[in-house]
UniProtKB/Swiss-Prot annotation:
It comes from Rattus norvegicus (Rat). One of its GO terms (biological process) is regulation of cell cycle process. GO terms for cellular component: cytoplasm; nucleus; perinuclear region of cytoplasm; plasma membrane; ubiquitin ligase complex. Signal peptide: none annotated. Residues 86-278 form the DCUN1 domain. The DCUN1 domain, also known as PONY domain, mediates the interaction with different cullins. The DCUN1 domain mediates the interaction with the N-terminally acetylated NEDD8-conjugating E2s enzyme leading to the NEDD8 transfer from N-terminally acetylated NEDD8-conjugating E2s enzyme to different cullin C-terminal domain-RBX complexes; the neddylation efficiency correlates with the DCUN1D5-cullin and DCUN1D5-E2 interaction affinities. This domain is also involved in CAND1-, cullins- and RBX1-binding. Keywords: Cell membrane, Cytoplasm, Lipoprotein, Membrane, Myristate, Nucleus. It comes from the Eukaryota. This is DCN1-like protein 3. A lipid is attached at residue 2 (N-myristoyl glycine). PANTHER family: DCN1-LIKE PROTEIN 3, RP42 RELATED. One of its GO terms (molecular function) is ubiquitin conjugating enzyme binding. Residues 1-87, 285-304 are annotated as: Disordered.
Length: 304
C-alpha cells in the first residue's frame, strides 16, 4: 500500500583514531630528516597508509563503520506510516463516492449504490455482517466514523477488499460467541435511534429474526414467526429482553417444546407462544385424524 525510500546520511562529525582524539594543538612525531609538522588524520581512522591483512585500508574500514544506516525498525515504522496514510486516502475517496451531498454520512441512496458495487442486496445477511463490523447505529446509514473504523476493523480500503472479506465474516458469524454478539447488535441496529425507540416494531423484528438466523435456522423459528404474524393485535412490539432471551430459548428448548416450563424466568410472551403452538399442534393432529377416518367415522376403505 505504499513504499518507503529511506535515505542514509553520514554523521556530520568524525570519530577519533583508535588511540583516542588528539589535542588540536599537539604535533605528530617527525619523520626521518623532516621538520616537525601537524599530522593529517583521515576521518574515522589512522593514516591511509595502514593496511589490514585482507588488503583493506584501515581508514576505509573505519569510514564504512561510521556510515550509520537507518535501523530496520525505523524503516519499518516509516513504511507502516506511509501505508496507513495511503489507505486513509483510499478510504476517503471511497467514502466520498457514496456520501450524501449535505450530510457527512452515507444515507439510503448512497447505501444502495454501495451495495450495488459490492454485488449484494441491501437486505441480505452479508450487509448485516458489514453493519455489525461497522457498528452502525441505525439501518441505511453509515457515518464517517463508522465507515472508516469498520473498514479498518476488516482491513479493507476498497470495494474489492471488502468483497474479499465476506467469506471470513460468514465463517466468523458461525462461532457461538461471535454470533451472540451479532444477534444482540441486530436488535439495536433495528431501532430508530433518532426517535428514541426502546422496542422493535413487530414487522421489523420478524424481518430481522429471519435475517440474523440466515446461517443457523433453529427448528422453532418458523413456529415463533408464525405466532407473531397471526397475533398482530396482541403484540405491539418486541423488547430487548424478549429479543435476547429468544436466543436462549432456541438453545435450551426442544423442537417439541416439551421441556418448556412457565415456572422458569421466561418472558410472558413465551408462555403465550408455547400455549398457542401446543394448541395449534393439537388441532392439526385432530384434523389429520378426521381426514383419515372419513365421513361419519368410517375408514376410506369401508366407504366403498
Amino acid at each position: 500500500m505504499g513504499q518507503c525510500v529511506t535515505k542514509c546520511k553520514n554523521p556530520s562529525s568524525t570519530l577519533g583514531s583508535k588511540n583516542g582524539d588528539r589535542d588540536p594543538s599537539s604535533k605528530s612525531h617527525s619523520r626521518r630528516g623532516a621538520s616537525h609538522r601537524e599530522e593529517q588524520v583521515p576521518p574515522c581512522g589512522k593514516p591511509a597508509g595502514d593496511i589490514l591483512v585482507n588488503g583493506t585500508k584501515k581508514a576505509e574500514a573505519a569510514t564504512e563503520a561510521c556510515q550509520l544506516p537507518t535501523s530496520s525498525g525505523d524503516a519499518g515504522r516509516e513504511s507502516k506510516t506511509n501505508a496507513e496514510e495511503s489507505s486513509l486516502q483510499r478510504l476517503e475517496e471511497l467514502f466520498r463516492r457514496y456520501k450524501d451531498e449535505r450530510e457527512d454520512a452515507i444515507l439510503e441512496e448512497g447505501m444502495e449504490r454501495f451495495c450495488n458495487d459490492l454485488c449484494v442486496d441491501p437486505t441480505e445477511f452479508r450487509v448485516l455482517l458489514l453493519a455489525w463490523k461497522f457498528q452502525a447505529a441505525t439501518m441505511c446509514k453509515f457515518t464517517r466514523k463508522e465507515f472508516f473504523d469498520g473498514c479498518k476493523a476488516i482491513s479493507a480500503d476498497s470495494i474489492d477488499g471488502i468483497c474479499a472479506r465476506f467469506p471470513s465474516l460468514l465463517t466468523e458469524a458461525k462461532q457461538e460467541d461471535k454470533f451472540k454478539d451479532l444477534y444482540r447488535f441486530t436488535f439495536q441496529f433495528g431501532l430508530d435511534s433518532e426517535e428514541g425507540q426502546r422496542s422493535l416494531h413487530r414487522e421489523i423484528a420478524i424481518a430481522l429474526w429471519k435475517l440474523v438466523f440466515t446461517q443457523n435456522n433453529p427448528p422453532v423459528l418458523d413456529q415463533w414467526l408464525n405466532f407473531l404474524t397471526e397475533n398482530p393485535s396482541g403484540i405491539k412490539g418486541i423488547s430487548r429482553d424478549t429479543w435476547n432471551m429468544f436466543l436462549n430459548f432456541t438453545q435450551v428448548i426442544g423442537p417439541d417444546l416439551s421441556n418448556y416450563s412457565e415456572d422458569e424466568a421466561w418472558p410472558s410472551l413465551f408462555d403465550t407462544f408455547v400455549e398457542w403452538e401446543m394448541e395449534r399442534r393439537k388441532r392439526e393432529v385432530e384434523g389429520r385424524g378426521a381426514l383419515s377416518s372419513g365421513p361419519e367415522g368410517l375408514c376410506p376403505e369401508e366407504q366403498t
